[in-house]
């Protein structure tokens, strides 16, 4: 089985770490390049356990020139990049009245522009090499639904989904696939603090979710793994929701 080279951003914890670990564990042909703003003990364990199959770069994704150089280095070392899971992002929780335009710019710069930068670089590289590429953006149900105090995050995710749809149509003939995976509330690294510090809001999210619980990072990783796999050969320009039924209401 030939190597499949993939990038996972925001790989240090939560959904990003669960995806990285699953891809390494499930298929020996997967070579994963992790990009995250910081390292940790869990990533060190992956480096020890998987050796050359896991390579880590420390970078914020909004360091756009640095990320471009990383992608070039990966391609020079491994060859063409087959897939990318763009998971890294930030959120802010402020009402619209208290969210100035600079905050909107900051969130959009990380969640939207930085991911467009990665996608454009991969598309251009693979067009040059006449190779397909599968790009998956981790979005959010917030991009499609209205939420109090999350307008900055919502704008960034809905804009990212708009780019995804247009790029998917534009490059489908070149065997480029672009999709979004939009989780609901997930038990990632912030979950315990959220339950403790925002109990009323946590209870509300449970009441809004038909399945009556938050999702698990591993559940999102399962879907992401399929969406960038060779088994997924006909899906592009689509947002898949994994939210316990929230958006079905």
PLM region spans:
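Conserved glycine-rich Rossmann-like NAD(P)H-binding loop of the short-chain dehydrogenase/reductase
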Residues: 24, 28-43
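Active-site helix of classical SDR
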Residues: 119, 156, 164
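Alpha-helical segment proximal to the catalytic Tyr-Lys
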Residues: 124, 169-173, 233
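Residue(s) in the substrate-gating loop at a strand-loop-helix junction
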Residues: 140
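C-terminal substrate-recognition "lid" of short-chain dehydrogenase/reductases
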Residues: 213-242, 247-248
